[in-house]
Amino acid sequence: DLIIVSFGTNEAHSRRYLAQAHKMQIGRLLGMLKAACPEAAFLLTTPPGAYVGRRRARTINPRTVTAARIIKEYAQEHKMAVWDMYNIVGGKTDACRNWTKHHMLRADGIHFTPDGYRLQGNLLHQALIKAYNEYVATGLE
């Protein structure tokens, strides 16, 4: 079994976001999941990027980059796979701009249109198939 866990958008939305508290929350949730599913493998994903603020004063969420880093650190420290959607779609400078430019974000600047969610799913699917094909080709884990 593979459990895919996506973190970061909601956690980083709060102005009171604390990176170490986020890391502890990840650990608690994954601890419960591991206890319930001890044989499962885990894949963590970073957030896709989001805006904060009201329409006219909306800015790219500056905390998302930290949330993505914390998720990657946690995955590395616990030998878990991570798919870094945040950097794949443009990272700090372009993730939100790319989503907006292609009309894949809803008006709230946080949630996605159906096409935006489909694209995220397709990108993850492509990454999983690529990793599987590399695994089969090399026989390495």
Identify what each model region corresponds to.
Residues 2-6, 41-46, 81-85, 111:
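Structural recognition of the beta-strand scaffold that forms the well-ordered cores
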Residues 10-12, 48-51:
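Short, catalytically relevant binding-site loops at active-site mouths
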Residues 17-25, 59-66:
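Alpha-helix N-cap and loop-to-helix initiation/capping positions
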Residues 26-31, 68, 72:
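Generic structural signal for well-ordered alpha-helices
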